Design a protein with these regions (language model features):
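Conserved catalytic core of the tyrosine transesterase superfamily
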Residues: 1-173
Length: 173
């Protein structure tokens, strides 16, 4: 395992300690490790050997491999966060990833359901069964509140206040 990969392991451990989503930790680990593997293939094994040209060449390779702009931009943001960690812990003098520009990703308006689609969706569960009632309640909460599926799955009975008509949700941000 290279020294760079050891820094990555420490960074991922710090994300876990900071209660980052397991998906975030996994995705950051996979993506940053892929970059570090690329560095190793280029003969780069220390932070001192890293420069903007290496990072740009890596981003160009991702582009050539068919990665979409949003995926490349995500990699830049992940590398910036990793670099920030290294600087904050006095491992690296300057986060050169901050000087790499992420590709602009056009923002699309979300596709929304029509009233008819919502009615059909909510009518789909068979509410004559306990499972169907549960599924209908799940759909109602998702549609009516806008919570993420991961937030809904994390709810417990103590998070539901029927008297006040409230759900207590701890979200991402």
């Amino acid at each position: 395992m290279s020294r760079l990969h050891k820094w990555l392991d420490r960074y991922l451990s710090s994300l876990e300690r900071d209660n980052a989503s397991p998906y975030t930790v996994k995705n950051y680990g996979t993506d940053i490790s892929q970059f570090l593997d690329y560095c190793g293939e280029q003969g780069i094994h220390t932070l001192e050997q890293l420069d903007r040209d290496v990072v740009r060449a890596y981003m160009a390779e991702l582009n050539e491999d068919g990665y979409v702009r949003a995926s490349i931009a995500r990699r830049v943001f992940e590398l910036r966060a990793f670099g920030d960690y290294l600087v904050q812990h006095d491992i690296w003098d300057e986060n050169l990833f901050r000087r790499i520009y992420a590709p602009r990703v056009p923002r699309k308006l979300p596709r929304y359901l029509t009233i008819e689609e919502v009615k059909r969706l909510l009518a789909a569960p068979d509410t004559s069964t306990p499972k169907g009632m549960r599924d209908r309640a799940i759909l109602e909460v998702l549609y009516g509140s806008g919570v993420r599926v991961s937030e809904l799955v994390g709810l417990d009975l103590r998070d539901v206040d029927l008297a006040a008509g409230e759900l207590h949700v701890i979200g991402k941000g």
